[in-house]
Structure formats: C-alpha cells, structure tokens
Amino acid sequence: MSYPLFLCKKNSDFMKVEQIYTGCLAQGAYYIESDGEAAIIDPLRETAPYIAKAKSNGTTIKYIFETHFHADFVSGHLDLAEKTGAKIVYGPEAETGYSKHLAKDGEVFKLGKVTITVLHTPGHTPESTTYLLKDEVGEPYAIFSGDTLFIGDVGRPDLAQKKGHLTAEDLASWLFDSLRNKIMPLPDHVLVYPAHGAGSACGKSMSKETWDTLGNQKQTNYALRADMTKTEFIEAVTDGLLPPPVYFSANAKLNKMGYESIDTVMARGAQALSPDEFEKIANETQALLLDVRGKEVFVKSFIPNSIFIGLQGSFAPWVGALIPDLKQPILLITEEGKEEEAVKRLARVGYDNVVGHLAGGFDAWVNAGKEVDRVETIDVDTFATRYTADLNLLDVRKPGEFDAAHVKTAQSFPLDFINEKMSKVDIKNQYYLQCGSGYRSTIAASILRARGFDKLINVQGKFNDIAAGPIPTVTAACSLGKS
C-alpha cells in the first residue's frame, strides 16, 4: 500500500515526498520529486510503480539512492536504472559487481530545486548511508535513514560481521558514533523516514509508526538517549538478538553483485501447467510444491507434500526463513488470478526459480481426480475439551511470544527454526500445533506432514482465546493456575 503524499512544511510546490510502504515486508521505499526530476530511495524489485508515477507526473527519474545492501529483500535498483537511465548511488564502502556512483561522505546531489546530501552512517553495515533532503533554501527537511535509525529502534549490528575481523560490538560502536555525530545534531523538525517498520527482522523493537520527527525520536527512542554511554548502547543493541533469517546473507549478496531481470523472472513463472503436467514435473524434479492460498481453504485439503505459506500473511519473510535455497525450483498452487502476485512476491526476496503454476488452481487438481491430503484442524473450543496435561503441544510462535505467555505444558517449537528443531520431535507421536492465530501453525503442520508426520492436529484460533479459557497458561510474571 502507499501512504499519502507528505508535502514540505512550507506547503509550496517545489518538492513532494511519498513513502511507498509494503506491509508484508514492513518496508518503505521513497519517491522524491522536484521541478521535473525524481529520485527513488530503496526501491522494491518491481519497477513499474515508480516508472508509472514518474510518467504520470511528467518527471524524469534521475537518481536511485541505496541506503545499504539490503538483506531482507532484493532491491529494484538494477532494473530501474536499466529502464530509466537513472544513476545508482551508494555511500562510501559499497563495493558492487555493477556500475554505480560511489558517493563521498558529504557529497551533494541536486534534484530540481532541492538537494540530497550523503551522510555516511556505518553501524548496521559498513556502507550504511543516510540521505539528508534539504529544501530550496538549503534548510534540512528530512532524512532517509535506511536501517541506521528506525522509529523507536536502530538497525541490528550483527548482519555484516566478519569472523576474526568485524564483530557485532564493533559495528554497534560505529552505529553509536554515526547517530551521535551525523544524525542527532540535525534540527528537531527534520522528518525521519526509515527503511522498515514493525515486523521487520532488521531491528528488535520497531514502532508500528513508519515516520516521525527527529525531535520526538530524541525523546522516545532508547538508542538516542542523550546520556547513554557507548558501553550502554553496545549492550542494549546487541542483547537478545535472534539469529537472522537464513535468506538474509543471500539477498545481501544479490543486491551487491547483481541479479536476473524481474521481467525474465515473471515470464518464467507465468507458465500455466495442467494437472498432469504439474504432477509430472513434481514427480520428476526436486521442485517444491508451494501452496499460497488462504489458510481457511488449505486446511480443508491440499496436494500431498505441498507446503503452505499463504499470501495473506507475512508471506515473503516466511518463505525466506523456511526455504534455505534461493535457487530451489518452485511449483505454485494459487487461487485463480493470484499467480502473478505470488511470483512477484517471491522475487522480492530472491526466489526467482518459479517454474510454473497449476492452471485452474486447486479445483482443477480435484476435478482431475488427483490425490489430496489434509491435516485434522480444530478450533480453540474443541482444543479446550481435548486438552490434557500429557498431550504433546507444539507452540510455534517466536521465543519472545512464548516467554511472555504460553500453555503450561507446551513445548516451544518456533517456526523460524523448524528445520533445526526437527530432531526434537518423534514421527511416531501425535502432536497438536498452536500459534497466535492459526497461520503459522498451518505452515508448521504442512511442513511436518510433508516430512511424514501423520498424527497432527492443527489448532486454529488466537492464543488470547486459548489463554482466556480453562487451559492452564503461564505468563512471564506468574502461572495463571487454571484447572
């Protein structure tokens, strides 16, 4: 979705800034326009929206500014530059496998009647850069802070570690200096436009808000506390970091070295396959069967050995967390009309090898008389009637959610690390699976079922509803002691 245009504070027509926010990635790209020229900051992989916007406004895309080598999505800088002739700009320390302008700290770029100044702000990564937008009279208006500064948080400092050379503590030290020397001295009225909001794995405790004033962040963001020492800062930003999703390093490499054109990826994924063709490819190759329909229809029945990750949830991050090989051939099962969206959203996180989709969707498979499978699914009320202290309950929520509150007898089995946790479960046992809403438990059930577990019961419903019922639960503070 796109947020409304945020016009400059003087309400004149020399500049406009639009945040283009993609909820499933919790990612913000930016369109800046002034006097017939436009710049895009941290674009997503699909380039059409930016090109269409510039064409509609009668502007030329002059620059593509990248704040760093993104790890959680594949940026659209290469395709956008190829199609528009715009110059790709990175800050210092960004060595790439393609042509770009390597800007110096303090370098100024003119865009129409405004300017954009490079502020090298290493810490999240060595090349991390913040871009300072100044208005027609040279007054600071906004910063595009990438993963250096979020609303309520800062970027995690562990993604660019180099064993024996660069530690998370080293990067956190740089981040402290970047914030104090480059960002905090700016005027309080300056707007902060980060690359991510709540839900991204690039930080720990981001706000649901996606922009703010720097002055308010100085008052509310723990990392900008004026009296915080560097030691305190390093401890705060490195404490409690979960391992990054497995696809992060691969995405960062694609952004650094280059990737296949999105048009080629979309064309390959557009291949429609009959049920017989789909089955033949599935049987003869190592293709992964990925079902992206809604969980409400998936739980009724699905193609044997298919994995569920529904488009309606945090699709791309879960794909990245659960499918370790970006080159994995993928066959799609979608709702009719959702084929292109599925291919596009996979490409956003570097999964470019979709080899086709089931023409006519799951109904075509059923109508062709093909085999189907299902996992028993129950609601919260039914679960309450079946619950006993000795049943095997897998809570697939994140460790922090589990620690905050969980069913007393549940085993923490976080979906993020299901591949690593397989040795903790016995294929002979019966397991109930539960999460916060039913989306993640359905993903987990599909993965376990594809690996031969046939005694699974998927609990659909909110954890809060489970906690409100008779089943004993434990919170971080105490046991709720229900019987």
Predicted regions and their residues:
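Conserved beta-strand hairpin/beta-sheet module of binuclear metal-dependent hydrolase folds
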Residues: 14-60, 131-146, 151-152
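Core dinuclear metal-dependent hydrolase active-site scaffold
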Residues: 16-20, 30-33, 108-138, 142-143, ...
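Metallo-beta-lactamase
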Residues: 38, 125-243
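Active-site neighborhood of phospho(di)ester-bond hydrolases with catalytic His/Asp-centered motifs
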Residues: 40-41, 61-70, 89-93, 120-123, ...
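Active-site metal-binding loops of divalent metal-dependent hydrolases
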Residues: 43-44, 69, 93, 125, ...
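Active-site metal-binding motif and surrounding structural segment of the metallo-beta-lactamase
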Residues: 47-89
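Rhodanese-like catalytic fold shared by cysteine-dependent sulfurtransferases
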Residues: 156-158, 169, 216-253, 257, ...
